[in-house]
Amino acid sequence: NMAKCADKFSLIRSMQSYTSKHGEGDVHVMCGSELDRNVQAPGIGAVLSLQQKQQAPIPPFVHLGDMKHPSYSAPGFGGYLGRTHNPFLIKQNPNSNDFRVQAFDTARGVDVSRTFGRKELLRSLDRYQSSAEQQLEFARSHNTFTEQALSLATSASAKSAFDLSKESPKLRDEYGRNRVGQGMLLARRLIEAGVRFVTIQGYVDTGIYAWDHHWGIFP
């Protein structure tokens, strides 16, 4: 089967790894450095998040899936740059019929106008806090994520970017009716909407490393 589609391969011959271990390889690819168990390096998306101001309400860095390697903690996240540069996580399956991004859900009984009011109240309270440089890193990241969540909840353009129902059934079929295929389509929509970096968890619908065939390759 692989021979039949070999003409479609794009080989990157300059790319190599110093290790055959998957977890260390993840870190190498996502962070551009070898694994250091004492310091977690930031990923490419985190660096882009640092260098480019967020185009509110669209987050600069999005990850589709629950990226937790069995051996290592979230390679490619904020690392030593801080949690504020972690990706916006979408753990829901984009291939499910009821897929939706929970950040767009407002609290029960709270309409958009009240959400805007809460956002302004939060900003007012933040002005009475210490400057960002004097806050704990966790507090700074909490403020960032809260602001991001409120922006998403009140943005029609952001909701549209995450809405796969706007694509034709034919195109969705071409991308593949599975978690990865629909994730690829969603990633394209997000990049077009202004997200600078999107990562997709490479599992299909098996819950394991579906790309890594240690056995059963040949019939």
Please place each PLM-identified region on the residue numbering.
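Ligand-binding pockets and gating/stacking loops
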Residues: 1-219
